[in-house]
């Protein structure tokens, strides 16, 4: 991953910021709170040209997203972070996103340190 960034701390910083914004939006989303998201993907996009569009990340592939009946989910409801157990509809989406945020944050810091 470091090699593909070509030492560009700004790219890592932009992706990291986008992932943080995505997590914030998902945590505030009524739709996300009531849907199990299985098999979706994150599409990372950036142009190697410095004059291209800013680096970003997008959620894609929602074919297996299903609304969950609130009565079928024990309190505190669907968290997207709780461990999956048969019938709890937890998908681990936010756990995975948290891990990606940690990875991109570490990449950003490493590239910033290397550029000094």
Where does each model-flagged region fall?
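Polybasic, positively charged surfaces/segments
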Residues: 1-116
């Amino acid at each position: 991953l470091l090699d593909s960034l070509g030492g560009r701390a700004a790219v890592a910083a932009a992706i990291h910021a986008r992932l943080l914004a995505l997590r914030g939006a998902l945590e505030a989303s009524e739709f996300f709170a009531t849907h199990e998201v299985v098999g979706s993907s994150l599409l990372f996009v950036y142009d190697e040209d410095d004059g291209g569009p800013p680096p970003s990340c997008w959620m894609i592939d929602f074919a297996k997203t299903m609304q969950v009946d609130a009565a079928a989910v024990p309190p505190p409801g669907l968290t997207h972070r709780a461990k999956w157990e048969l019938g709890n509809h937890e998908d681990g989406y936010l756990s995975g996103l948290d891990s990606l945020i940690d990875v991109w944050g570490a990449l950003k810091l490493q590239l910033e340190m290397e550029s000094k």
